[in-house]
């Protein structure tokens, strides 16, 4: 974990990327904000009721005098953001509805990012994934050519570093969706200094089993390879592989001789949300890997979701990752 963060901090040095932390009334978030403020790579913007936040800071003995603190209910920016929200939603929200929605810290924070007043957002310490992601999908939306956002986890232990996806967002995926996630995951790997070798996973290796589920992954491999070639993406994408064939050279030699990947994959695209979510938790709980994420990909600007059981360190680390995404 330290190696990844050190690489990102080097990239971010002197950049002072503005990251919105909507949950300023949470002590973990406020503590992390003071730690980030002390760096030259992230400048936090904290949202919340001034009286509550200042009282919390006093209780925790935190100096927040240099942190930008915004109360969505009383901010001078609100009128401007309300108008921008109404225009962005194109008839799906009245001004009155927008006024009410922007009292919500996640909507207000997301609008700060959309309006260019911040570079990214980290939330979820006190909100559900839906509460964090919904405003992003409505306001920031996905990049051109990307139809969905997806959630990857960095799985880290010692000097081992892998990406697992999608483990957080999409319950049902067709071949096109899997291909898109494979390409976006490869781009994420590149942006974090990895040489992407993407394995698309199944219970079959190179046709060893036959079913509609296997066919879906096989089609996804072809689509992902085609998309990567069109975009001149420096990545290897191959499949379908069982997990052992994707990560153990000796198994790959027997099960998939001649495959582009020979047990050296570092990015794993799971065939379903079920498989991805279960897979990362097994690696985390039984394998002893640190699971950093979910890191959302495919959005026009970075928005990331914390676990409600997160630590101060988690808030800090995900803010660093979000800032690095903003520089892409």
UniProtKB/Swiss-Prot annotation:
Single biological process term from Gene Ontology: acetyl-CoA biosynthetic process
Localisation per UniProt entry: Cytoplasm
Pfam families xref list: PTA_PTB
InterPro entries: P_Ac_Bu_trans, P_AcTrfase, P_AcTrfase_dom1, P_AcTrfase_dom2, Phos_Acetyltrans/Butyryltrans, PTA_PTB
Statement: the UniProt record of this protein carries the keyword Transferase: yes
Enzyme Commission code(s) on record: 2.3.1.8
Enzyme category, top tier: transferase
Keyword terms of this UniProt record: Acyltransferase, Cytoplasm, Transferase
Gene Ontology terms for molecular function: phosphate acetyltransferase activity
Pathway noted in the entry: Metabolic intermediate biosynthesis; acetyl-CoA biosynthesis; acetyl-CoA from acetate: step 2/2
GO cellular component: cytoplasm
Keyword Repressor: no
Signal peptide coordinates: none
Reaction equations catalysed: acetyl-CoA + phosphate = acetyl phosphate + CoA
NCBIfam families: PRK09653.1 (NF007233), pta (TIGR00651)
Entry similarity comment: Belongs to the phosphate acetyltransferase and butyryltransferase family.
The name this protein goes by in its record: Phosphate acetyltransferase
Underlying gene: pta
